[in-house]
A protein has these predicted regions:
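Secondary-structure capping and domain/repeat boundary segments
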Residues: 1-276
Length: 276
């Protein structure tokens, strides 16, 4: 500022302060650079003199933005200009079905920006800093079960949004049983929702833990016994049908009329043809 000219013995109003100092507030004019007496409108001019601007250091508000996390308490603090931020809080963020979150530090912007720490110096304005997060996609256990047959796996870990896979090998049919694949379901024994019709299941996109069930039915084979009278009279029941391992039960009888050479007595049922 330029010097101000005054007359001896006058009370003078000093020129408005034109000085600025970043991070400080002007306190007034003083007779010394530190300490001294504050000059007022009642100060009388008695000669050439130098007055000194004195300043007070400002404090500014540092505000914490959790940026999707749980808000911290207190949500801000006062930091003096030029001082370091000091201890900063560590926020948390709740997991969701897709991600877990780990705190990655405080930054000057919600996305990007520059990382700040306890040693960062406070500038000359109120400041907001933003929590950044590292997201980790969650994985879930997908289980597989079957009523009959074998599976290439019984469980696997699958990332959220991806699909699991499992292949069923059907059991072989044998004399006693016939096996039929009915599909993959969300509940045992064909319950819930059908999610697949082929032996290899590609699961729906994973959104949580789940178990899928291969539904294979097993039917006991049935066999028909046909009775051949082999020259005799046809019995009243020419055949019977029974399940595997089921007792045949009462068998029919038959007769054969005598001829000029022989008379015939029923000797039982055999699995090969016989004459005599």
């Amino acid at each position: 500022m330029s010097a101000q000219r005054c007359k001896y013995g006058e009370y003078v109003t000093l020129t408005k302060n034109a000085f600025t100092k970043s991070g400080y507030t002007f306190l007034g004019w003083y007779t010394a650079s530190s300490g001294g007496t504050k000059i007022s409108s009642t100060t009388k001019i008695t000669g050439t003199v130098t007055y000194y601007a004195q300043w007070s250091i400002n404090s500014y508000t540092l505000t914490y933005n959790a940026n999707g996390g749980n808000e911290v308490s207190p949500a801000s603090k006062s930091v003096q200009y030029g001082s370091t931020y000091g201890t900063l809080p560590t926020p948390t963020r709740n997991s969701n079905a897709e991600f877990t979150y780990a705190f990655a530090g405080w930054y000057t912007a919600a996305s990007g920006g520059t990382q700040v720490t306890a040693n960062t110096t406070m500038g000359a304005s109120n400041t907001t800093i933003y929590a950044h997060w590292t997201a980790t996609r969650r994985s879930y256990t997908i289980g597989y079960q079957t009523t009959y047959g074998s599976l290439n796996r019984t469980s696997q870990s699958v990332a959220y949004g991806s699909k699991g896979s499992c292949t069923l090998t059907m059991p072989s049919n044998d004399a006693q049983y016939t096996y039929t694949f009915q599909g993959w379901y969300t509940a045992a024994n064909g319950g819930g929702t059908k999610v697949g019709s082929s032996l290899t299941l590609d699961t729906p996109s994973v959104t949580g833990a789940a178990t899928y069930y291969a539904y294979v039915t097993r039917a006991v084979n049935r066999y028909t016994f046909t009775f051949n009278a082999n020259g005799g009279s046809t019995p009243s029941s020419s055949s019977i049908t029974k399940s595997y391992n089921e007792a045949i039960g009462t068998l029919p009888t038959c007769s054969r009329a005598a001829d000029n050479t022989y008379t015939y007595a029923f000797a039982g049922w055999f699995d090969t043809s016989a004459t005599g």
